[in-house]
Amino acid sequence: LMIKLADLLRKNAQDNILIIIAPRHIRRSMSIQNRVKSAGFDIKCRSKGDYPSKNDKFYLSDTMGEMGSLIEVADLVYVAGSMVPVGGHSPSEASQFGKPVIMGPHSEKCNAQIKDLVWSGGAIQIEKGPKMNENFLNNITELIGNNDRLEDMGKNSLIASGYAQQRADEASIHLLELLNKSNKQDVA
């Protein structure tokens, strides 16, 4: 899908975009490199000490512990694992950095957070269907270069991350109250 995106961006003269791929499983690094290269693109890899330059289209962040830095410099974050039925990955880091999020229909592992993000306008969730990939690509190309919309989405994403934190805080307080109550009953 990212290769199709790069092709589409090139055709639309939006080829000043760097697509950063940060695989959840680093063991997929060589496979990703081969797929990108076989599509006619060069790819730079963090594990080789490469850094992206102005004309690069793909950068593979195949090392651990750098997701925050990558998200911080991103204009838009695509949450992978959401276009296929694997439960979806969490957009929490992206929203905590106030970044606009785009993801597919599979968000089973983080439904409440996705609902908050979409409701707040901080994310776009592509609906499942025969035109899912096409809709994904169209949404991204519409967002790229629309700095006002990206900025608004980023602000909304940050607000939505506050909702998630508030829910977590409330759940923690409730659990502590239950634990406290249980301990008092055990003592009596």
Label for each model-derived stretch:
Residues 1-188:
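Nucleotide-activated sugar donor-binding and catalytic core shared by glycosyltransferases
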